[in-house]
């Protein structure tokens, strides 16, 4: 991971601007300001990259407001739909506070499985309107979601019948779901009762046993202790695999929700998981370990979809998320002011806003199911929305108006738009073309058109 041989040193990103932009977006979900970019490029320290990562991880609020998006996808926290018995708003507050505090991951998981005040929405599940089938009752939702999010297990198929895709049985799934039930659960196969009742049990009884005679609160407490115990190496392996997949575009095990699949580097997975546990289940520690590694600092590579076997060559180029795109647009608009030197805009981050059409088109899920990894393949709908959509047009028009009234000369506006949006100054050819678009009188429409061009540019939308 931290190899220092000559070949690896040569393969590290030479362009500081690319690295700092990657680090900002991956850690905080934000673009660096022009001042932060210039300061980093001008820093001659040999350890400036390590210092940058440390600084970014210490920005607790922006860190939390970025990573809350990932966990909201996992927990189906849509902001608008209430969990069973309420609690949507409360889990948002609990989650953000937990991320700001960098709560140890084992404690984080315990408080979600055996809820404290404010964290109970995840286990309560969603109460769907009308009649639901047996595989979507709240107890079964809890079992499916705990297995998927924290252990990388897919038991949804086995919630209806013995699984066709793995070895989990209907009886095992109902036994697991029964831990969350106040009364004995009737087993249903394909929504028809079998006449059997399930006995509460953990999926891996060799790791820990649930007392079937205990009341529900005690059973749930036992489960939280078992899942977060050192015996359950699956918890740590699952989360470090998710982190690796987020930063590199490909997990050590794929898919990330099928942790029984073979890994392409067992030693690395085991070492990362062991280091994670030995350092107090500290998520930021593992992120720092990954982001300061030579592996992370290698040049990005395109996804090779035709390869028979995955071979690590560096981080895979990825698209901005819906939230990163919208936060980036907001930052460029606010950068028109000379007083703008802070990270973020002071406005409500996109990840904390309700879902709208533009966000959904750009890939934010409705959160009616658990999503641990979003689709990243570009769609025709995205192309249409970005090129002709009213929401994007309104954002670009607003940018044109704000920058037109900034008091800057046209050339200054052009340079600032390029450096804020793409992280670099325009080439001479680009500068001449931009001057023709903007005009001599800071035409709002011309500025809007230039910003639209830059916002559609791969250098803006891709994290390289």
Where are the predicted features?
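Short, structured secondary-structure elements
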Residues: 7-10, 14-206, 234-274, 283, ...
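Extracellular beta-rich ligand/substrate-recognition surface
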Residues: 213-217
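Hydrophobic helix-coil surface modules that form long, contiguous segments used
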Residues: 223-224, 383
């Amino acid at each position: 991971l931290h190899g220092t041989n000559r070949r690896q040193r040569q393969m590290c990103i030479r362009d500081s601007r690319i690295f700092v932009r990657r680090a900002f977006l991956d850690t905080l979900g934000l673009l660096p300001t022009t001042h932060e970019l210039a300061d980093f490029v001008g820093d001659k320290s040999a350890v400036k990259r390590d210092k940058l990562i440390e600084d970014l991880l210490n920005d607790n609020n922006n860190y939390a407001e970025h990573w809350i998006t990932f966990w909201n996808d996992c927990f189906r926290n849509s902001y608008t739909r209430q969990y069973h018995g309420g609690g949507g708003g409360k889990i948002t507050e609990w989650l953000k506070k937990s991320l700001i505090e960098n709560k140890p991951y084992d404690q984080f998981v315990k408080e979600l499985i055996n809820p404290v005040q404010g964290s109970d929405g995840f286990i309560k599940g969603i109460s769907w309107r009308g009649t639901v089938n047996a595989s979507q009752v709240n107890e079964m939702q809890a079992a499916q979601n705990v297995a998927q999010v924290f252990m990388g297990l897919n038991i949804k198929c086995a919630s209806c019948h013995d699984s066709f895709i793995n070895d989990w049985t209907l009886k095992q799934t109902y036994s697991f779901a029964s831990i969350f039930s106040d009364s004995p659960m009737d087993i249903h196969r394909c929504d028809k009762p079998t006449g059997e009742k399930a006995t509460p049990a953990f999926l891996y009884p060799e790791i820990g046993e649930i007392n079937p005679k205990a009341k529900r609160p005690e059973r749930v407490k036992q489960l939280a202790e078992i899942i977060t115990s050192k015996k359950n190496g699956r918890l740590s392996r699952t989360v470090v695999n998710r982190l690796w997949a987020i930063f590199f575009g490909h997990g050590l095990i794929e898919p990330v929700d099928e942790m029984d699949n073979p890994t392409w580097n067992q030693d690395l997975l085991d070492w990362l998981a062991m280091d994670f546990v030995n350092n107090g289940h500290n998520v930021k520690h593992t992120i720092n370990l990954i982001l300061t590694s030579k592996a992370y600092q290698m040049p990005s590579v395109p996804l090779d979809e035709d390869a028979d076997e995955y071979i690590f060559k560096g981080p895979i180029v990825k698209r901005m998320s819906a939230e990163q795109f919208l936060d980036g647009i907001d930052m460029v608009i606010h950068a028109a002011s000379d007083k703008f030197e802070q990270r973020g805009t002071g406005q409500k981050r996109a990840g904390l806003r309700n879902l709208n059409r533009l966000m959904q088109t750009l890939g934010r899920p409705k959160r009616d199911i658990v999503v641990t990894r979003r689709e990243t393949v570009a769609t025709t709908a995205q192309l249409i929305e970005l090129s002709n959509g009213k929401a994007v047009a309104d954002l670009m028009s607003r940018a044109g108006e704000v920058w037109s009234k900034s008091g800057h000369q046209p050339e200054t506006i052009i340079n600032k738009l390029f450096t804020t949006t793409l992280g670099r100054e325009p080439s001479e050819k680009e500068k001449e073309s931009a001057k023709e678009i903007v005009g001599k009188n800071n035409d709002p429409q011309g500025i809007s058109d230039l910003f639209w061009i830059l916002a559609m540019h791969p250098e803006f939308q891709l994290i390289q």
